[in-house]
Amino acid sequence: MNDIELKTIARDGKARLNEVTLNNKNFQTPLFMPVATRGALKSLPFNYLEDTDIILANTYHLYLRPGLEVIKEFGGLHNFIGWNNIILTDSGGFQGWSIPNKFNDDGIEFKNIYDGSKFFMDPTLSMDIQQTLNSDIAMILDSLIDINKEYDEQLNAIQTTKNWALKAREHHSNSNQSLFGIVQGGKHKELREKSATDMLSLDFNGYAIGGLAIGETQQERKEIVDFTVEMLPQDKLRYVMGLGDIEGMLDLIELGVDIFDLSLIHISEPTRLRRISYAVFCLK
């Protein structure tokens, strides 16, 4: 795994402005990551994002099309799409929730959305795909379930996520790639605490808070994030997955969150967030 250098240069309560260095590339947080699902933005050229530091690409979709052999011929995703800044790849966990599938303790059986065939994604395959893509930041495969599921189901999901995280951590071997753990647990603070403890024990390069923006109220989300952030280390990035509206991001920036993403968002939002973040921290 590749360490991320993080320096907090300004604070406003729990909110923080960080200078971050990864693979000789520098960026500041808080930031929003535009989602380039298959390595491209819909209806927009990459030069539209010339001032953007990070994009998110989708492991599930890139694995299916164009496929790893094509991307491998280019030496990785950066060269394939002509992107010189940072790429974060998700693991396939969200598609495990959003696309009809079958979960078991070993992984997720998917139906290929292009041809209907079935394939099985487990923690090691997810790592193999992301290491072949050679993204700067990879995510572990996690067990994402509806936030309103019962306690026992949430408990099983965090145990599965822990087991998958351990397998991913052991399998990961790309020294140029950072690896993030994911904290799950639904609305239950004791499960969020247990999941955070599980992730911290594996000493990842950064930590995501997952399972949000899929059914909870705004107040519930703030309480979950506030509680969880307090358990995460100051010297690691904090990433709330799947949230990218301005009001929602500002709520969580105030609680110390650094990174956000959302596929269903107007492309002008990241630029607006950047302006707001400068105002929040009164840099001048």
Where are these regions (language model features)?
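Catalytic cores of alpha/beta
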Residues: 190, 194-197, 245-257
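Non-catalytic, usually N-terminal nucleic-acid engagement modules in DNA/RNA processing proteins
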Residues: 1-173
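Single conserved hydrophobic/aromatic residue that forms the stacking wall/gate
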Residues: 265-284
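Short helix/strand-capping turn motifs
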Residues: 243, 257-264, 268
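Active-site beta-loop-alpha junctions enriched in small/polar residues
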Residues: 34-38, 60, 92-94, 143, ...
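Alpha/beta enzyme core
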Residues: 132-136, 160-179, 184-214
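Short beta-strand/loop segments at the ligand-binding rim of alpha/beta enzyme cores
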Residues: 86, 174-181, 231-241
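Glycine-enriched alpha-helix->loop->beta-strand junction motifs that scaffold or abut catalytic
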Residues: 51-52, 134-135, 199-207, 233-235, ...
